[in-house]
């Protein structure tokens, strides 16, 4: 095969005499390199973009389920403190009837269940139309929460304190020994619509979260 060439591009470099030598201004050199290396770097840029999308979804899941917010903060221009506050908001609010003495144990048990969720993100595939990708996500459903609630509801309780103690003890049991379903792989779209609708009923990322941790 013969080499293929694109249209000729003429660049103008600003060269100034500096004593006995000549120097090219930084701005002029940057402009030249951006023209000369654009096509050379484009394949690398495309790969970096794909890996960045994969890292974003992985960091979103890690922040949502495990409170690991460092990478998620970088992707969302939040501070780590702001990302951690996002993780804490509402997720661990106990039932209003729960006795005050059990609130912290409830939160700790729920966090421990969520931290043991199992998932991994695959390499994204670029689809037509700008920022538009699909990605395989492999999930081992963490059935601990739904199993804990089913077990708790089978008990008999005679006071609010017994209800609180029973709920927390059951959650702690499954936090110590999680239960899992069968491994499955789902194809998840990652685009502006899926990101904007995250958290809404039947949204793609909401459905993914419910697959990871059924409720």
Each language-model region and where it sits:
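Surface-exposed, charged secondary-structure patches
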Residues: 1-2, 97-167
């Amino acid at each position: 095969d013969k080499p293929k060439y694109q249209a000729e591009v003429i660049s103008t470099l600003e060269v100034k005499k500096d004593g006995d030598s000549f120097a090219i201004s930084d701005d002029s050199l940057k402009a030249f390199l951006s023209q000369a290396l654009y096509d050379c770097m484009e394949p690398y840029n495309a790969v970096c973009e794909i890996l960045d999308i994969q890292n974003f979804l992985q960091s979103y899941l890690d922040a949502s389920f495990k409170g690991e917010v460092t990478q998620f903060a970088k992707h969302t221009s939040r501070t780590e403190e702001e990302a951690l506050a996002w993780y804490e908001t509402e997720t661990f609010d106990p039932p209003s009837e729960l006795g005050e003495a059990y609130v912290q144990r409830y939160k700790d048990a729920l966090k421990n269940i969520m931290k043991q969720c199992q998932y991994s993100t695959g390499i994204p595939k670029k689809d037509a139309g700008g920022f538009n990708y699909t990605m395989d996500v492999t999930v081992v459903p963490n059935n601990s929460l739904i199993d804990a609630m089913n077990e708790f509801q089978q008990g008999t309780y005679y006071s609010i304190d017994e209800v609180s103690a029973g709920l927390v003890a059951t959650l702690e049991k499954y936090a110590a020994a999680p239960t899992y379903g069968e491994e499955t792989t789902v194809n998840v779209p990652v685009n502006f619509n899926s990101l904007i609708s995250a958290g809404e009923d039947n949204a793609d990322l909401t459905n993914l979260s419910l697959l990871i941790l059924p409720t």
